[in-house]
């Protein structure tokens, strides 16, 4: 894509998209509420262990946004060394991550996230989750899910993982 500069005789420099990848992994922990993709999942088993609500979808999306913009990672911005973020909702972290990325001179094109695990069952609430995530980011967020066919920690039901990509454009 080439953007035109109004009144200029030649096209402006091409707008180069920047892509980032993010991951997040949490173990299940009895006694915690299960938050995933910005939603509370009643009846889907125990929640996830973590400094915040351990929402692997929101956290992976944050990491992908920071990666695309070259602005560090989730731990740098919201890690255990930052007590003000203890217990924070993943959707709050995602909203703040999007703000940080935009303040860094970038616009967000989109984010895609995949949950790896046998629960929660994403399909039944996919549209609701995508709406909540997209509102937090201020750009389209798509959500998919996969299992690991009984292999590894997700297959054994010990936890879940989130994998994300984000596309951003420099605006400044």
UniProtKB/Swiss-Prot annotation:
Organism: Streptomyces griseus subsp. griseus (strain JCM 4626 / CBS 651.72 / NBRC 13350 / KCC S-0626 / ISP 5235)
Annotated transmembrane regions: none
Catalytic activity: 4-CDP-2-C-methyl-D-erythritol 2-phosphate = 2-C-methyl-D-erythritol 2,4-cyclic diphosphate + CMP
Keyword terms: Isoprene biosynthesis, Lyase, Metal-binding
Binding site for a divalent metal cation: 24, 26, 59
PANTHER family with a match to the protein in the record: 2-C-METHYL-D-ERYTHRITOL 2,4-CYCLODIPHOSPHATE SYNTHASE, CHLOROPLASTIC
Keyword field contains Metal-binding: yes
Cofactor: binding comment: Binds 1 divalent metal cation per subunit.
Family designation: Belongs to the IspF family.
Site (Transition state stabilizer): 51, 147
Protein's UniProt name: 2-C-methyl-D-erythritol 2,4-cyclodiphosphate synthase
EC number: 4.6.1.12
A GO molecular function held by the record: 2-C-methyl-D-erythritol 2,4-cyclodiphosphate synthase activity
Origin: domain of life: Bacteria
Binding site for 4-CDP-2-C-methyl-D-erythritol 2-phosphate: 24-26, 51-52, 73-75, 153, 156
GO biological process, one term: isopentenyl diphosphate biosynthetic process, methylerythritol 4-phosphate pathway
Pathway: Isoprenoid biosynthesis; isopentenyl diphosphate biosynthesis via DXP pathway; isopentenyl diphosphate from 1-deoxy-D-xylulose 5-phosphate: step 4/6
Physiological role: Involved in the biosynthesis of isopentenyl diphosphate (IPP) and dimethylallyl diphosphate (DMAPP), two major building blocks of isoprenoid compounds. Catalyzes the conversion of 4-diphosphocytidyl-2-C-methyl-D-erythritol 2-phosphate (CDP-ME2P) to 2-C-methyl-D-erythritol 2,4-cyclodiphosphate (ME-CPP) with a corresponding release of cytidine 5-monophosphate (CMP).
Cofactor section: a divalent metal cation
HAMAP family named in the record: IspF
Assembly information from the UniProt record: Homotrimer.
């Amino acid at each position: 894509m080439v953007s035109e500069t109004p009144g200029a005789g030649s096209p402006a420099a091409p707008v180069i998209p920047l892509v980032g990848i993010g991951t997040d992994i949490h173990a299940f922990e009895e006694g915690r509420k299960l938050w995933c993709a910005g939603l509370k999942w009643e009846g889907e088993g125990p929640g996830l262990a973590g400094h915040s609500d351990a929402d692997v979808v929101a956290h992976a999306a944050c990491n992908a946004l920071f990666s695309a913009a070259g602005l560090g990672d989730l731990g740098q911005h919201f890690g255990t060394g930052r007590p003000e973020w203890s217990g924070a909702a993943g959707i709050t972290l995602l909203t703040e991550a999007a703000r940080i990325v935009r303040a860094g001179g970038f616009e967000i094109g989109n984010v895609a996230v995949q949950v790896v695990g046998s629960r929660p069952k994403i399909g039944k609430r996919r549209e609701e989750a995508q709406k909540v995530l997209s509102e937090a980011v201020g750009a389209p967020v798509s959500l998919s899910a996969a299992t690991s066919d009984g292999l590894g920690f997700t297959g054994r039901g010990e936890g879940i993982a989130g994998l994300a990509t984000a596309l951003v454009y420099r605006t400044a």
